[in-house]
Amino acid sequence: MRHGDISSSPDTVGVAVVNYKMPRLHTKNEVLENCRNIAKVIGGVKQGLPGLDLIIFPEYSTHGIMYDRQEMFDTAASVPGEETAIFAEACKKNKVWGVFSLTGEKHEQAKKNPYNTLILVNDKGEIVQKYRKILPWCPIECWYPGDKTYVVDGPKGLKVSLIICDDGNYPEIWRDCAMRGAELIVRCQGYMYPAKEQQIAIVKAMAWANQCYVAVANATGFDGVYSYFGHSSIIGFDGHTLGECGEEENGLQYAQLSVQQIRDARKYDQSQNQLFKLLHRGYSGVFASGDGDKGVAECPFEFYKTWVNDPKKAQENVEKITRPSVGVAACPVGDLPTK
């Protein structure tokens, strides 16, 4: 893990995160013009950082937030489509990989709300991962939720998963990606005040807890509704910050992520190897007791057992300690039911 140079090496993946200014757009033509601007940014960053292998843009950086429902449907993208073609050409031309936001992606059933989607494009211009946000930011966001995470081989073989904004507030998604082999978890977000300190803290904690690199790209600026705090960052698998932007519009950070170092740590670390220890619980004591050398593999957590085996029961249980309705009468949002 290195920070401060403009290079990369056969073992290191050069990663840049962009504090992209939140656009305020209304039409398809405006969206496509913004895509072309993003393509220009890629070319400029590659010129300045010749070691760049992967560039990451925030959630909503392509479309902005369409506060008008009809505009949201009118500007929703197909994958592949006109927007992705612009990104693909930029990645191919500059020989870099890129992560791009589509808010939204058309639902397969035209009348249903679009998805909030990220795509990972390789340096040949091919879409190698399409991730749909599993946990939209309710009650404000009205995206149709996705249903799974993905892990793919990224630049130089580094294994990459994509997550989006509010997804990252749930430890389960980080653990799912890491347990499936992700070595870099990319979190693209359009996060606004007042949650700045919490969001800076959680990505460090999740990198540490899951022995994984984390790259965060967040929006900046004011779109007339929300003020976005930036602080795009790159975190090492030991939870230390390698590079972090401030609140500057269109700033960026860059670091080199070693493929070998993270694999070495996951293989040889002992006291802080959370991934191994979770599925080999108490192995020291179990071995000393003569009960084998694998520890305990069974899940000890009642909530997770219930969730997997009886999701409706788990939902009912959480309503007992929170509330039974999606809406809140004391502070209604839209037409969400409060009873």
From Swiss-Prot:
Keywords: Hydrolase. The active site is at E59 (proton acceptor), K133 (proton donor), C165 (nucleophile). It comes from the Bacteria. Its EC number is 3.5.1.4. Optimum pH is 7. GO terms for molecular function: amidase activity; hydrolase activity, acting on carbon-nitrogen (but not peptide) bonds, in linear amides. Induction: Repressed by iron via the binding of the Fur protein to the amiE promoter. Residues 13-259 form the CN hydrolase domain. It catalyses: a monocarboxylic acid amide + H2O = a monocarboxylate + NH4(+). Optimum temperature is 55 degrees Celsius. Inhibited by iodoacetate. Pfam families: CN_hydrolase. Gene3D superfamilies: Carbon-nitrogen hydrolase. One of its GO terms (biological process) is metabolic process. PANTHER family: ALIPHATIC AMIDASE (PTHR43674:SF14), NITRILASE C965.09-RELATED (PTHR43674). Homotetramer. HAMAP family: Aliphatic_amidase (MF_01242). Asp-167 is probably not involved in the catalytic mechanism, but is probably involved instead in maintenance of the structural integrity of the amidase. Expression of the amiE gene is stimulated in a mutant deficient in urease activity, suggesting that production of this enzyme is regulated to maintain intracellular nitrogen balance in H.pylori. Belongs to the carbon-nitrogen hydrolase superfamily. Aliphatic amidase family. Catalyzes the hydrolysis of short-chain aliphatic amides to their corresponding organic acids with release of ammonia. Hydrolyzes propionamide, acetamide and acrylamide, but has no activity with formamide or urea. The natural substrates of AmiE in its gastric environment are not known. Probably functions to ensure nitrogen supply to the bacteria. This is Aliphatic amidase. It comes from Helicobacter pylori (strain ATCC 700392 / 26695) (Campylobacter pylori).
